Amino acid sequence: MTTATFPVDLASYKTIALDPSVPTLTDEQRDALAHNLQLCRDAIVFFTAYAGARGLSGHSGGPYDTVPELVILRGFFEHSKQGGATKVMPIVWDEAGHRVATQYLLAALEGELPIEKLFHYREYNEHLPGHPERGYTPGVKFSSGRLGHMWPYINGVAMAHPDHVLFMLGSDGSQQEGTDAEAARLAVAHKLNVKLLIDDNNVTIAGHPDDYMPGYSVAKTLEGHGLDVSVGNGEDLDALYTRMCAAITSDGPVALVNKRLMAPGMPEIEGSTHGHDVFKASAAIKYFEQRGNQQAIDLINNAPKVDSRPQYPGSSDETDANRSLFGKVMVEILQEMEPEERERTVRVFDCDLEGSTGIKAIHEAFPEIFVAGGIMERGNYSAAAGFGFDEDKQGVFATFSAFLEMCISEITMARFNRSNVLAHFSHAGVDDMADNTCHFGINNLFADGGVAGHDGSPDNTRVYFPGDPAQFRACVKRVFTDKGQRFVFSNRSKIPYLLKEDGSRFYSDDHRFEPGKDDLIRDAGPSGGYVVSYGATLYRALGAVESLRKNGVDVGLVNKATLNVEDDAMMQKLAAAPFVLVAEEFNIKTGLGARFGSQLLKRGFTGRYNHLGVHKEGCGGLWRQMGFQGLDPEGIEKSVRELIG
């Protein structure tokens, strides 16, 4: 726990009451708001950049942007608290959960969270995860994090509290989600007192909406749904206050579309897509040089790095990011095609995450087949499936694994239409996921919901989660030309290469992947049992197996990279073993282990069985998320010992 003093004097925040029936600020009110605005932006720049300097990443620009709205809202809350005529629910709802720095700042200002706690933003087990989680962080009043989910939710809150006005911070990115369109229609139809404060900064992760989605306008879209819409400069305090007063004193839903550059006034960042992520230390230092805050500069320069993941027995020092490899391997495949054939038969759909899912490499190499689809996962998946409607064509789709849950119905309809889709869902599991629970990709096997067709043909959906970079490369190359829907999962974290017992790589550079075949990473003796694993859990399981074998326990390890097909030969081998433990980073209720035991029983298994998986909400931080779930080598070894008695 740091003993440093927080370098921004949050105690100097000036609490004022703002009466929305008086739409003009006094000089005193304006000065107080300007002071509070600068104070809050200073705080957000510091503790987010400090976390970034420590290696915890995060998001700075969104919470930085919406501070003018925030300080005015707190004035409305204070007036309502003092008995003002207009009841305002004192919650700053936010549909962009990555702007969680706003909620932590509020918790500190309201005395729910010690100010020094902000030094530990996104750190392991410090209760300040990368998205707000109700009941986990003191002072945080709601959970948010998946775009497009909050407005529909607070429509219901508004119905439950018809005597209150609700305010929600929105964004031009989140408003691209289809559920916001549904929420708009419901709010208008029922005249709900929901007021939207939309940060329209023309920036999302992968680009500028004006460039990649010409014709899209937040204001015109909301007007089309029937909302009253006010467009203005979000950095003009007086005008913003007047517009917010008009919104709060009118009946029914209102949207204030507040135009501004991303991160206005922020060195190196203003107006750029880099503002979505954590502010770089260099930018924050320049900012505090302008502010004359040497203490903040010194703290950022000397921020202690979080400790890195240990190396485990049986795996290499060298690591690679499979999520990035996906795009690189796809470029290699596409380069071998004739240009006309490539453009005619392949289309790649991005959901504003091209840099994170690896497909930016495809965008750069073959822009003619790349679709910058914005933040519209459901529609983009269906478009990819529609492109793959013809037998000789296929759509390629990529987003985070957490958002697979949003696409289940589209996946089902694609299956009914016999579509060809190669879907890469990165950030699977929980490893390195400081963004925490709402971004966990743990229900990925929901994708495997097909049944036999009318003609008796088996469902050809395939689900792959290779646990080694060389195997991942071979998998993508092998399954590219297969028919049907193929789901390839990767982790956020970099993972090492698996090693043979002699120290050489288990999978060579020319390895040929065979769908449905399990690999025996370590064989057990005639009386030995097995651990079955995949993904980023696999090399941790290997570490556990190596430790157990060193201490006289006869145990082997199986890599099950194809998750929804049984390898009969391997299953017979496992069915004859005295014990089997499945260790995985998917949901313990919906993952491989929940069904694997039944398949063993069908083959005559009489041994002991157990499975490990994600069984509780996250703890923040990076690689320690796995140990928190009992999925590090120590946890897996302990479970093996408990299983054998």
Predicted segments with their positions:
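Conserved acidic/glycine
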Residues: 1-72, 174, 202, 208, ...
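Conserved active-site and cofactor/substrate-binding residues in soluble primary-metabolism enzymes
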Residues: 35, 39, 61-68, 98-101, ...
